[in-house]
């Protein structure tokens, strides 16, 4: 069927709501818009769905959500998992509660019980709930930090981590088989509730989640002693973090928590930010204004689904607020956990730190200094979650901490996804420890640079939209594979890892070995002088990402090296 035929079908078929048909009638004379909405099926990728909200096959709406859920239901039934049920959560975005309910009712119509949170919750709490309730799967309706026009649908498996092989590919195949809405089952909510298939969850899971968060604290006595002297500014950026973050800080004893009023309440329109992303300085404008008014020590922002944390800290020497990258805040928490667990004799046997291949190399130096194994995985926190499962199955290591450069980390194994709630809690505990020792978080960061080296990292993203853009990205990856550079940013290329081919080629000796990681369209360059860079197309957006890192003799030296590498890699 052509896109125009599909459009006419949606306009005339009573299966679609009057509201949907009216929305489509309004674009009758706009063929470009019709084509964009109907030229393809919204792609169910390895993580799930993500797209602009609206009517059409290439949009996020109740019909595309039902279709994806029918595919998931078919897979669950094929795995004999229907008795275990599915946990469902949603964020503060437009249509999130509706999408969550539609997903639940589709599962219910397939005889699968759904445990649905009574209102918005952080993504990591869903990961926890899947494990706590013994579910076979989980669904989160969120588009993380994307602009307000977007929503999404993420799928988790029974270990509480986002789906990884073989489940991701198998679910994808089942979703692809659902080619018509006549294959999609649904039922009335009233009937589902009566049948015990639609179960509402809330406070009890919140309380258990909170207890797990607090168990990660190493020195609650230091918090009790110092908390009254620490001023914290926090913004949930109109998302799900407000209640759980404030609750865990309050229960631990932090009294001086100032929440940015304009961004406190959930609002899917994100009226104060174009892009609710804690990596973006613009997202911190209101928080930094409040920080200056109250003379805050630290400034924190969580993204709408509260799995990522952005940080600023006051440098008392200059009086200015300094931004921390995800690598920096992750390393501060990691150092604290490794140092204090070692000092208190609570470090488990065979401890392991887990990070993605594009995360800071400071982790390698840190792990070595504490005699801790460092395990590297592909980009995406789901692979860190998967690693925890492997540790438990094989009894090889004990997970201590995991982090990725994109502002996500996890202390503890109660969940299997990055958790900004535990990151806030741990960072505020680190700040308490620092305060007790007459330091700030920035002082602690300088200590890490002096101990391990001045590691700095960067990320540049190139957006290339449409069919032409996809071809360009493919061509760029092909060129880099077939014509590898000998030098980058003044650094010599020592080895090239091609994760698609599972090869690591030493350019000095010509020796080729395996990477040991699953196949992925990623190129990684090991450079001289402890530098590196990595190139990968985004899995969810029309983008190609360039990651790079250096080690300098000072902050200035590191910044200069980083700039040279960025210029050569991205701007040529």
Which residues are covered by each model-predicted region?
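An N-terminal, well-structured beta->alpha segment
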Residues: 5-103, 192-229, 240
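Conserved phosphate/anionic-ligand binding catalytic regions in large, soluble enzymes, centered on
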Residues: 38-58, 143-146, 232, 236-248, ...
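Short Gly/Thr/Asp-enriched flexible loops that form oxyanion-binding sites at enzyme active sites
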Residues: 99-107, 150-157, 307-327, 363
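Phosphate-binding and adjacent anionic-ligand microenvironments
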Residues: 292, 296-298, 320-322, 340-536, ...
């Amino acid at each position: 069927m052509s896109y125009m035929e599909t459009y006419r079908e949606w306009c005339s078929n009573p299966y679609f709501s009057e509201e949907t048909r009216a929305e489509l009638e309004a674009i009758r004379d706009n063929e470009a818009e019709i084509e964009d909405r109907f030229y393809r099926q919204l792609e169910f990728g390895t993580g799930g769905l993500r797209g602009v909200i609206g009517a059409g096959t290439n949009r996020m709406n109740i019909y595309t959500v039902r279709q994806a859920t029918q595919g998931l239901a078919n897979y669950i039934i094929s795995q004999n998992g229907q008795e275990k049920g599915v946990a469902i959560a949603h964020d503060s975005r437009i249509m999130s509660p509706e999408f969550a309910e539609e997903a639940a009712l589709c599962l219910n119509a397939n005889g699968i019980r759904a445990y649905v949170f009574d209102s918005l919750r952080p993504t990591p709490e869903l990961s926890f709930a899947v494990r706590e309730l013994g579910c076979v799967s989980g669904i989160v309706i969120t588009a993380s930090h994307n602009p307000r026009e977007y929503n999404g649908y993420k799928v988790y498996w029974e270990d509480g981590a986002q789906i990884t092989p073989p489940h991701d590919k198998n679910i994808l195949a089942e979703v692809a088989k659902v080619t018509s809405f006549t294959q999609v089952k649904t039922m009335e909510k009233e009937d589902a509730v009566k049948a015990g298939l639609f179960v509402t969850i809330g406070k009890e899971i919140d309380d258990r989640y909170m207890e797990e968060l607090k168990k990660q604290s190493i020195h609650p006595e230091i918090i009790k002693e110092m908390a009254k002297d620490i001023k914290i500014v926090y913004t949930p950026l109109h998302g799900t973090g407000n209640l759980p973050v404030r609750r865990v800080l309050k229960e631990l004893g932090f009294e001086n928590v100032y929440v940015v009023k304009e961004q406190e309440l959930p609002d899917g329109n994100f009226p104060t930010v174009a892009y609710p992303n804690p990596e973006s300085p613009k997202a911190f404008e209101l928080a930094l204004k409040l920080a200056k008014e109250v003379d805050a020590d630290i400034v924190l922002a969580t993204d709408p689904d509260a799995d990522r944390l952005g940080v600023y800290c006051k440098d008392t020497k200059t009086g200015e607020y300094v931004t921390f990258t995800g690598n920096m805040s992750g390393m501060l928490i990691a150092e604290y956990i490794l140092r204090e667990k070692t000092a208190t004799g609570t470090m488990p046997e065979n401890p392991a730190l887990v990070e993605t291949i594009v995360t800071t190399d400071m982790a390698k130096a840190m792990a070595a200094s504490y005699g801790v194994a460092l395990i590297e995985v592909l980009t995406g926190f789901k692979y860190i979650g998967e690693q925890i499962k492997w540790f438990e199955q094989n009894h090889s290591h004990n997970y201590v901490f995991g982090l990725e450069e994109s502002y996500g980390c996890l202390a503890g194994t109660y969940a299997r996804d990055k958790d900004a709630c535990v990151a806030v809690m741990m960072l505020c505990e680190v700040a308490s420890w620092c305060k007790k020792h007459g330091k700030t978080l920035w002082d602690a960061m300088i200590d890490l640079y002096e101990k391990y080296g001045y590691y700095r990292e960067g990320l540049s993203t190139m957006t290339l939209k449409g069919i032409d853009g996809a071809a360009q990205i493919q061509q760029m990856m092909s060129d880099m594979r077939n014509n590898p550079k000998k030098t980058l940013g003044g650094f010599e290329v020592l080895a090239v890892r091609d994760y698609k081919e599972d090869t690591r080629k030493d350019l000095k000796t010509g020796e080729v070995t395996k990477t040991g990681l699953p196949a992925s369209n990623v190129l990684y360059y090991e450079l001289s002088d402890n530098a590196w860079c990595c190139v990968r197309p985004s899995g969810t957006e029309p983008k190609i990402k360039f990651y790079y890192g250096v080690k300098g003799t000072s902050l200035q030296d590191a910044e200069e090296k980083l700039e040279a590498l960025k210029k050569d890699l991205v701007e040529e």
